[in-house]
Amino acid sequence: MRKSFNLREVTKSDWKVLLEWRNDKITRQNSFNSDLVSVREHKEYIKNMITNPNRTLFILEYNEIPVGTIREDRLEKDELELSYTISPIYRGKKIGQIMMSLYLIERKGSFLCEVKEENSPSIKMIEKLGFKLFNKEKRVNFYKLNLS
């Protein structure tokens, strides 16, 4: 079988798998909000995400199976903050690097990421993609990548 990756925008029908990933123990440890999320809260979040013109959530599919998400939040005209989640069963398989590479390949501007300093897999991945550390504050590393 040929390996096929597809990065697409999230739809309302993706809510269940996204909630499973969001409430995963390791995802919550690495998130800035580590609270469990209810079905009602999550469905409302997805609905608001889809209608927010300054926020877009993408899902990466591998052979049509959802394996990760990347969210962009527009801060300025050419500046986006990125955050991402990998399916628990696909962690450690370079999915994050593939997903970020597919996302960044045809984009221009400044891209920011905030990563907890203890999240070494994420730090290693974004540094490999060329993100540079520009600030540290309260155990959070701030990274930036400029693409022109």
Give residue ranges: language-model regions.
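Acyl-donor (CoA/ACP) binding surface of acyl/acetyltransferases
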Residues: 1-17, 21, 57, 61-148
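Hydrophobic residues in alpha-helical segments
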Residues: 22, 31, 49-50
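Conserved GNAT-fold acetyl-CoA-binding loop/helix
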Residues: 26-45
